[in-house]
């Protein structure tokens, strides 16, 4: 059994708000809370992960995987973003009791409908257009300057350190 952790340090709006509030950079805020998290884990006697991979350290990996997904027809570029096409996976809903028609527009409260999606359950792999106009961390990509979506981060980090076949993924 392998255990890994990503600190999800890619600078979404809460990070920027915290950085402004504390008069620090986004990366300083990320490091502060990463250190606090692991200090708490130590106090609780939680085993340290086998791997701690900052999400920002794998931008090249994300771009390679997204490019491969586009080339193989599993992702598409629309409205400035790259989306994963959930209709390409026949068994996408195998782990829940819902049909696609039963699912809400977004997985979380506050997720807005996106007219650029081919399917309501598609998700962004790479943002160049976002509701967070002042995104703190951005990188060059074949699709424009932007940042990765959380789904691609989890997938790439898991594949790099645990292989392509996972028995359990949670978080």
Question: Predicted segment positions?
Answer:
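NTP-dependent nucleotidyl-transfer catalytic core
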Residues: 1-171
